[in-house]
Amino acid sequence: VLLHAGAGLLQGAMGIHGAFVAGVPMVVISGESMTYGEQPEFDPGAQWINNLSIAGGTTHLVDSIVKYTSVAGSVHTLYESVVRAGELAQRQPTGPTYLSVSTETLMDSWTPPANPRAVPPAPRMLTAPEDIEKLAAQIAKAKHPVVLTEGAGQEVETYEALVALCDKFALPVVEKPGALFANFPKDHP
């Protein structure tokens, strides 16, 4: 997600916070001018020094609603910074990360690295088999088991597995009023 300077970052703060609460992985990038027209042959415009600069940089605007903040200071560190922010966004618990990338860096010429490192797929967190067995035993012993949902709908596979489990054992489902996702079909018998 590319947002405009501090102003766009603040306008996007509610969406970023929602992603943080819901555990939605994303990389958010914005930045500001670092040279304010003093860099030869690069004039970002007068609006930067007058209206768009944030004292101390933009990272502190969102550091409480993202997992990680950093500054990509040049085109030489940009690729690896984006990869790292993406990896961190996808690691458990998932959520948004933020990179401050200056206008000068965004506008600079970039050559991809000759040998970019292979980016591994995001790790998946799986429940230990012994925990699944414990849960199955608890459900089997319960006289009137009920499933309470909150965040199962984030992944299609989890959603479908929950429906199949509840169908197989005729388990009633209650969705928490503040559920983060659609966790169970509303029209399910």
Predicted regions and their residues:
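N-terminal alpha/beta PP-like core and its mobile active-site loop of ThDP/TPP-dependent enzymes
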Residues: 1-189
